[in-house]
């Protein structure tokens, strides 16, 4: 019996909607990253994108444990000397709540072209509304 390898053109991708309200950031991000990779499917193949589309709503209501609200820092650099910028979780969740979940999930995906394709299947919205109702996403409990 030969080893099964999924073909990119035969992969069936479903759409799921995840409510982030009251969820812990890390636990939510690990489950989302796993589903974006397709590890929950029996036909998972490491070198083929077998994952599903994930729509995350209520991103501004995600929570972190302990003192991470004020202590967790997000860094970015302009590329110029002295161009490092930092912002803590509390300010970032007020400014751009989508980026908190996107950053957490992106760090859990492969750092290569396949990982970038997986990341493009993640859609994050700060409110309860999203423009993907035409895809009829299924509710996913995490």
UniProtKB/Swiss-Prot annotation:
Ribonucleoprotein among keywords: yes
A cellular component term, taken from the record's GO annotations: cytosolic large ribosomal subunit
Signal peptide (UniProt feature, chain positions): none
Keyword Ribosomal protein: yes
This protein's UniProt keywords: Ribonucleoprotein, Ribosomal protein
Entry-linked Gene3D superfamilies: Ribosomal protein L13
One Pfam family this sequence matches: Ribosomal_L13
Highest taxon of the lineage: Bacteria
CDD domains cross-referenced by the UniProt entry: Ribosomal_L13
Biological process according to GO: negative regulation of translation; translation
Alphabetized GO MF terms: mRNA binding; structural constituent of ribosome
Family indicated by similarity: Belongs to the universal ribosomal protein uL13 family.
Role this protein plays: This protein is one of the early assembly proteins of the 50S ribosomal subunit, although it is not seen to bind rRNA by itself. It is important during the early stages of 50S assembly.
UniProt subunit comment: Part of the 50S ribosomal subunit.
Protein name according to UniProt: Large ribosomal subunit protein uL13
Species the sequence originates in: Stutzerimonas stutzeri (strain A1501)
Gene name per UniProt: rplM
